[in-house]
């Protein structure tokens, strides 16, 4: 029986039998500041939407899409990054955030941050028109 399940950038929706498998729950790393940018490819969408900041969120998984209570968030300034550069940065700070969350859970010393549904945004895979708009805004993948 595991103590904790850790999902990193998971794109599966877990059901209760998996979520409840571990004594201390299941956590996931999402590369955006939840509750905004739930769903897929947040690095694309924060760049396309000209956000000044993004970050990572480590949260307890529930049966929703990136909707569980947040344990740790880390913020990063975007500047003029390419998507590839942003992914590299958020993966690095994401690993630090996962380690911090595991430590807090192990010590049972954390205050959950509400993942407020009323403030959520959700994104899926970009359409051709989204990619065109991305390029028109001077954004780059590489």
Describe the predicted segments one by one.
Residues 4-129, 133:
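Donor/substrate-binding cores of folate-linked one-carbon enzymes
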Residues 139-142:
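SAM-dependent methyltransferases
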């Amino acid at each position: 029986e595991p103590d904790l399940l850790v999902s990193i950038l998971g794109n599966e929706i877990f059901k209760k039998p998996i979520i409840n498998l571990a004594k201390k729950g299941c956590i996931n790393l999402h590369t955006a500041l939840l509750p905004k940018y739930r769903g897929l490819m947040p690095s694309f969408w924060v760049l396309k939407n000209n956000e000044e900041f993004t970050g990572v969120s480590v949260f307890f998984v529930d049966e929703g899409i990136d909707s569980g209570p947040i344990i740790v968030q880390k913020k990063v300034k975007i500047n003029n990054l390419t998507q590839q550069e942003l992914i590299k940065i958020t993966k690095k700070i994401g690993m630090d955030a996962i380690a911090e969350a595991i430590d807090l859970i192990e010590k049972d010393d954390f205050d959950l941050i509400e993942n407020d549904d009323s403030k959520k945004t959700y994104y899926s895979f970009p359409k051709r028109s989204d990619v065109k708009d991305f390029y028109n805004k001077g954004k780059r993948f590489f």
